[in-house]
Amino acid sequence: MKKFFISVVFIVLLTFTTFINSATAAKLDDNVRTLPLNEDKEVVLTIKEYTQGKREFTNVCSQCHVGGITKTNPDVSLDPETLALAYPARDNIEGLIDYMQNPTTYDGFIEISEFHPSIKSADIYPEMRNLTEDDLYAIAGYILVQPKVLGKQWGGGKIFR
């Protein structure tokens, strides 16, 4: 009886996992995953990169940026408009990677690596130590896909939840 119960639970979990992954893949078609690489080029994020970005964002970034908001400064979120108005613009993959490597204030004038987790400050923020270039690319891609999936809920704060 115990083996039967374990088998049933395993089959249910396997079916549920397969269904969830299929649903995620269906929502994230090529159009949703097409993102600006920089000011001139676009790229299509793979499902694998999206999944990797989601995992790394959840593990490293979500303690301050859950749902695309910024807990320490709610005026500066990860929504597309806010990212586009930053200087330099952070509404593309290369811009976000640059920020994760060397963060600056919203106007771009002051370096803030000792206050914001980054690759440059990995000695202060150990969660950044093991992130590779591929991880940064995936995180940036995840950040840029989320507004297409969640709309104004991403970075919109309490009012949109």
Swiss-Prot record:
Q: Which PROSITE patterns match?
A: CYTC
| Keywords, alphabetical | Electron transport, Heme, Iron, Membrane, Metal-binding, Photosynthesis, Photosystem II, Signal, Thylakoid, Transport
BP-aspect Gene Ontology terms: photosynthesis, light reaction; respiratory electron transport chain
Q: Does the keyword Transmembrane apply?
A: no
Tagged with keyword Membrane: yes
Q: Which GO terms of the molecular function aspect are on file?
A: electron transfer activity; heme binding; iron ion binding
What are the GO cellular component annotations? photosystem II; plasma membrane-derived thylakoid membrane
Co-factor remark = Binds 1 heme c group covalently per subunit.
The record describes its membrane topology as: Peripheral membrane protein
Q: What is the first-listed, main subcellular location in coarse terms?
A: membrane
What superkingdom does the record give? Bacteria
Q: Where does this polypeptide localize?
A: Cellular thylakoid membrane
Q: Name one Pfam family in it.
A: Cytochrom_C550
From the UniProt annotation, give the residues forming the signal peptide: 1-25
> Binding residues for heme c, per the UniProt record?
61, 64-65, 116
Q: Which cofactor does it need?
A: heme c
Q: Its family? A: Belongs to the cytochrome c family. PsbV subfamily.
Q: How does it assemble?
A: PSII is composed of 1 copy each of membrane proteins PsbA, PsbB, PsbC, PsbD, PsbE, PsbF, PsbH, PsbI, PsbJ, PsbK, PsbL, PsbM, PsbT, PsbX, PsbY, PsbZ, Psb30/Ycf12, peripheral proteins PsbO, CyanoQ (PsbQ), PsbU, PsbV and a large number of cofactors. It forms dimeric complexes.
> What is the role of this chain?
One of the extrinsic, lumenal subunits of photosystem II (PSII). PSII is a light-driven water plastoquinone oxidoreductase, using light energy to abstract electrons from H(2)O, generating a proton gradient subsequently used for ATP formation. The extrinsic proteins stabilize the structure of photosystem II oxygen-evolving complex (OEC), the ion environment of oxygen evolution and protect the OEC against heat-induced inactivation. Low-potential cytochrome c that plays a role in the OEC of PSII.
What name does UniProt use for this protein?
A: Photosystem II extrinsic protein V
